[in-house]
Amino acid sequence: MTRFLAILFALLPCIHSLSYGEELRYATWNIRWEDPKDVEKGDDWEKRKGPIANVIHAHNFDIVGLQEGSPYRLKQLMELLPEYEIILSDTMEFNPIVMRKGMFTVADFGRFYLSKTPEKKSKSWDSKHARYCTWAKLKFKQNSLFIFNVHFDYHGKDAQAESAKLMNRKIFSMAGNAPFIFAGDLNFTADSKSYQNLDTHIMKDSRTAADSASVPNGSYNYFNPERASEWTFDHIFVPPYTKVRRYEILNETYRDGEKLRYPSDHSPVAIQIELGGKN
């Protein structure tokens, strides 16, 4: 598979480069695929792309892991985010990594599949689709930061459980002692068997580790601001030694005439962390 780094716009001058001890804002966000039924309900992409970009701008994220993008929709979104660049692991990328220009250089990137044969496009266990992880190794002042952006299968419980085990192995072998962020739409909640399969010697949940948190509702919002949600399928994990300053589920809406709408059927989950390597 040909790998490439897609930079959709000319690079801006480097304004700031991170160092260990500095803080970084990361978000994971499933921006919803294009379901024809969404158009009928008034939640079509043409309405949503502007509010999605507005949320990213308003919260000043340094890195965003997206899920359920598509090539032409990602191109449209990046046109609204000229201060960001995008990492695509393939021409048909749905889980890109978006990062602020000038903060990092990309040392390496790619994808592996959530299957028994992760090196090739494949699905295993009871997975309905061939799911994968988009990853990147970012450099800042001679230091490294690994990003693992995933979207687990929604159908197969065995696939979810085995994908969690695979992520344990991949993060351990690829990141080593370097700081990392493992995040995405995992399609399971914190009380599930799959969640319990994540190795706490390798990672911790930023939600439970945060110094402060804002959790007005679950991350899955049904596209309905009037419906309370208790389901959080979107998670962010970091190494045990990483300081998590803030965790938030962002209950952001936009106005469409007299109606309030969500930009996606998932709310973005965001953290503020202090970068640092293992002592």
Question: Could you say what each language-model-derived stretch is?
Answer:
Residues 1-23:
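Bacterial Sec-dependent N-terminal signal peptides
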Residues 15-80, 165, 275-279:
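N-terminal, active-site-proximal structural segment of metallo-dependent hydrolase catalytic domains
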Residues 24, 62-63, 145, 179-181, ...:
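Short, Asp-centered acidic motifs that coordinate Mg2+ and/or phosphate
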Residues 29-31, 150-152, 185-186, 267:
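Active-site metal-binding loops of divalent metal-dependent hydrolases
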Residues 63-144, 152, 248-250:
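Structured beta-strand-rich core segments of catalytic domains in phosphoester-bond hydrolases
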Residues 64-67, 88-89, 181-185, 205-209:
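Active-site neighborhood of phospho(di)ester-bond hydrolases with catalytic His/Asp-centered motifs
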